[in-house]
């Protein structure tokens, strides 16, 4: 067995939006604080999530969470609270992350995000919620970047189909599973 160091990915997600409110700073500055902390503890990669609420959920999808803790009544409204970054913001975060000596990635949840992230990410991360979205997997795989897939919320048959799909397109590396 090879003795290799684990590759640690810090899930930034969209968590920094709440930090920005608490500290009364911009979300971009809060995201950079998260990157700073990840670099301080020796993390290998900072990972974000890229989406627009309009592309991932219906405006009428009801909340599935405890409304006493989060009063937002629709999934769309909640996702919209956390989809403020654009391509320029992600480019700035990418450059900042690389300057700190870490890799940068962001899980895209739509085609537009996958496309603009192509020149930034060191690899793509596909969410387990997208493992049955074969056209999207083909789109990402065809970009030729390494691909990490999350399998936590997927059936084994979905994982198998996603892997077989990636094998049919030009990808350079596939890693699974990811552990959240």
Regions found by a protein language model. Give the residues of each.
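Catalytic domains of carbohydrate-active enzymes, especially glycoside hydrolases
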Residues: 33-49
């Amino acid at each position: 067995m090879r003795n290799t160091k684990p590759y640690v990915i810090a899930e930034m997600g969209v968590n920094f939006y709440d930090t920005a409110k608490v500290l009364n700073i911009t979300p971009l500055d809060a995201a950079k604080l998260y990157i700073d902390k990840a670099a301080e503890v020796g993390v290998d990669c900072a990972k974000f999530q890229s989406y627009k609420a309009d592309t991932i959920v219906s405006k009428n999808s009801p909340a599935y969470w405890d409304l006493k803790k989060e009063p937002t009544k629709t999934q769309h409204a909640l996702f919209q609270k956390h989809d403020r970054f654009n391509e320029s913001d992600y480019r700035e975060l990418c450059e900042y992350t690389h300057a700190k000596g870490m890799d940068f990635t962001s899980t895209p949840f739509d085609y537009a995000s996958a496309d603009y992230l192509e020149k930034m990410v060191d690899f793509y991360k596909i969410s387990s919620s997208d493992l049955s979205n074969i056209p999207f997997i083909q789109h990402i795989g065809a970009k030729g970047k390494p691909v990490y897939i999350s399998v936590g919320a997927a059936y084994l048959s979905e994982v198998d189909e996603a892997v077989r799909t990636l094998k049919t397109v030009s990808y350079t590396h596939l890693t699974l599973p990811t552990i959240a």
